[in-house]
Amino acid sequence: MASVNVDFEQAGELKIGQVGIANLRVRTLDVPRLVQEMRERVSRAPKLFGRAAVILDFGGLSQVPDLATAKALLDGLRDAGVLPVALAYGTSEIDLLSQQLGVPLLAKFRAQYEPTAVSPPPPPPPPARAEPAPPAARPAPGRMQRTAVRSGQQLYAENCDLTVLSTVGAGAEVIADGSIHIYGTLRGRALAGAQGNPDARIFCRDFHAELVAIAGHYKVLDDVPMDLRGKAVQVWLEQDQIKIAALD
């Protein structure tokens, strides 16, 4: 039989990149309550949450849900308007559940939650000659965006702050591991402290954001007082609550 050569580079290019996937940390197995909460969120912000890809994280539960409950939850969330695409929390029980449900288990969550076996402490190392401390690592320079971030675009500043000198349009998303400074209008989404830094902040000269988030905590435009819209504001996290205040 003649062999067939397939040029995969021309047929399709596969890359693992930064994607906007929401993480739903499940705190109860009350499926109707979970579904109703999600339905309300989609209703309040359909452009943000409608058909959003969602990872289910059962790490906050004392017991893994059974297959019937997990199926009911996935079906309910789809009916509420979001798309559950994977499971987080890489224990063996969750791994089995993901196989039974036919959804992937995201490996990047395993190291965060997987308990490790306790091993005896290693013997103390022999005394070593004191070495001078290495110089402190310089922080990564901030990323600067001089042109507008348009609808459908996503901009990510890894391990640094992000400065945008123009507009962030509706449907656009800017993300930074540090703080975000926007000198134009913010109509899209801004997510600071993306790797969990609660001290990150968002500064904006003209605030109309669809969503702002810091270290995973978020607030949508419908929750923002009318007197702050269109103003220069700063956004910060205080006791796990998003705070927004005018700069003027």
From Swiss-Prot:
Ranges for region Disordered: 115-144
Compositionally biased spans, kind Pro residues: 118-138
Gene3D superfamilies, alphabetized: 2.160.20.70, 3.30.70.260
One example of a Gene Ontology biological process annotation: cell morphogenesis
UniProt KW keywords: Cell cycle, Cell division, Septation
Tagged with keyword Cell cycle: yes
SUPFAM superfamilies registered for this protein in UniProt: Cell-division inhibitor MinC, C-terminal domain
InterPro entries: CAP/MinC_C, MinC, MinC_C_sf, MinC_N, Septum_form_inhib_MinC_C
Assembly with partners or alone: Interacts with MinD and FtsZ.
HAMAP family for this protein: MinC
Family the UniProt entry places it in: Belongs to the MinC family.
Described function: Cell division inhibitor that blocks the formation of polar Z ring septums. Rapidly oscillates between the poles of the cell to destabilize FtsZ filaments that have formed before they mature into polar Z rings. Prevents FtsZ polymerization.
Protein name as it appears in the record: Probable septum site-determining protein MinC
Species in which this protein is naturally found: Xanthomonas euvesicatoria pv. vesicatoria (strain 85-10) (Xanthomonas campestris pv. vesicatoria)
Gene name linked to the record: minC
